[in-house]
Amino acid sequence: MSNTSDLSPVHVVGGGLAGSEAAWQLAQAGVPVILHEMRPVRGTDAHKTEQLAELVCSNSFRSDDAETNAVGVLHAEMRLAGSLIMACADAHQVPAGGALAVDREGFSQAVTAKLEAHPLITIVREEVTGLPPEEWGTTIVATGPLTAPSLAEAIQAQTGADALAFFDAIAPIIHFDSINMDVCWFQSRYDKVGPGGTGKDYINCPMDKEQYEAFVAALVEGDKTDFKEWEGTPYFDGCLPIEVMAERGPETLRHGPMKPMGLTNAHNPTVKAYAVVQLRQDNALGTLYNMVGFQTKLKYGSQTGIFKMIPGLENAEFARLGGLHRNTYLNSPVLLDGTLRLKSRETLRFAGQVTGCEGYVESSAIGLLAGRFTAAEKLGQTLTPPPGTTAFGALLGHITGGHIVADDEPGKRSFQPMNVNFGLFPPVDVPKPEGKRLRGKEKTVAKKRALSARALADCRQWLGLLGLGSGLEPAE
């Protein structure tokens, strides 16, 4: 490593997933960091603690399958790159079928401890209002989807472009000892065994047709929070409130988060449930479970009454009820360059959900890239962006090149947040077994395997050329 003792520090604004990962990558490369986090000086509607990298929605990092799932590929690439977020997630995983879910408190405490202990990282608890001052020099802004209005307004003034927004929602969490396990049972869908799992990682609450129809009707009629001042703000499609899905049609939920496929009632194996509500373990002790796909904007009074209609949850005690918050993000394809710098002020780099990516893993990955791009600049190195064939590159390409969709207005374009998915990757030739033509599901799986294998091979090559070691010790 080159001598970095005379380097001026990089300021990172925001101690969420992206900011924490960016700070770690910088420090591991030998670049001093000042990490600014406004909590506990100023809280948000969604955060409950002052820990860094607090998970405010689900505790799931989604699929850990690096062979046939794009987010699993991103997990693998981040591990290759020495990600702090992935190391702490792996160290604090809880059973969740094929998904990587974490004990949210243990996870954020581990991230906080690693950053506090790093000799090149200084954590400052203060709110940064508006854009960071010019005298700070190189700065990464990773203020997250709950970016304070003053900063959003400053960005608008700097760029002349409006920030964009969408709604995101939080699902309720239930105390395990209040769940009636004479009605519910443990099982992962199709008995799938995932990281740290057994194939029996979810609690399943069955409904017959009559119970389901009454439940859907109650959701549609329930008292909902009014957001008049945010009227016109769209929902992120991957995080629709449960009652909004119910309003789309009576069968929507049983083909979505309440689908009964791959599940057999342990108490009554011969009777197929019409719909199933799944609960996922939320902490390492197994004392808390969250309602999968049940993010909601129902008022608290309505939530408790309606969710207790679910068989097995008649006496449920809620550790946290569901909620809704407004997420702010940039029109990144217009405002940012290919390495996440603000075109109108190149000393500013943005990272995380404020750039228009969606999801814990994606936010962390963009923080990782922002940290590495910035470290290379500070060290006088040249760093080419990751190839578009990698999950890193596909996600970065969506944000900065823009998965830009034309709407009804000629010449007008819109940029929408998106999770990483194989649709963002360039096509790949699928190897054909001798004398066999692949069709249907077999062809789809083969294509995903080919995309994944190419991504990981190209990512290894990119990281090998990088010249920045990860230096990551196992998380505790």
UniProtKB/Swiss-Prot annotation:
GO cellular component, one term: cytosol
Pfam family name, one: GIDA
Cofactor(s) the protein needs: FAD
Reaction it catalyzes: uridine(54) in tRNA + (6R)-5,10-methylene-5,6,7,8-tetrahydrofolate + NADH + H(+) = 5-methyluridine(54) in tRNA + (6S)-5,6,7,8-tetrahydrofolate + NAD(+); uridine(54) in tRNA + (6R)-5,10-methylene-5,6,7,8-tetrahydrofolate + NADPH + H(+) = 5-methyluridine(54) in tRNA + (6S)-5,6,7,8-tetrahydrofolate + NADP(+)
Molecular function terms, GO-annotated: flavin adenine dinucleotide binding; tRNA (uracil(54)-C5)-methyltransferase activity, 5,10-methylenetetrahydrofolate-dependent
EC number: 2.1.1.74
Binding site for FAD: G14, G15, G16, L17, A18, G19
GO biological process, one term: tRNA wobble uridine modification
Keyword annotations: Cytoplasm, FAD, Flavoprotein, Methyltransferase, NAD, NADP, Transferase, tRNA processing
InterPro entries: FAD/NAD-bd_sf, MnmG-rel, MnmG-rel_CS, MnmG_N, TrmFO
Compartmental location: Cytoplasm
Taxonomic superkingdom: Bacteria
Keyword Transferase listed: yes
Entry-linked PANTHER family: GLUCOSE INHIBITED DIVISION PROTEIN A, METHYLENETETRAHYDROFOLATE--TRNA-(URACIL-5-)-METHYLTRANSFERASE TRMFO
Physiological role: Catalyzes the folate-dependent formation of 5-methyl-uridine at position 54 (M-5-U54) in all tRNAs.
UniProt family annotation: Belongs to the MnmG family. TrmFO subfamily.
NCBIfam families documented for this protein: gid_trmFO, PRK05335.1
Protein name per its UniProtKB record: Methylenetetrahydrofolate--tRNA-(uracil-5-)-methyltransferase TrmFO
Organism: Brucella anthropi (strain ATCC 49188 / DSM 6882 / CCUG 24695 / JCM 21032 / LMG 3331 / NBRC 15819 / NCTC 12168 / Alc 37) (Ochrobactrum anthropi)
Organism taxonomic ancestry: Bacteria, Pseudomonadati, Pseudomonadota, Alphaproteobacteria, Hyphomicrobiales
Name of the coding gene: trmFO
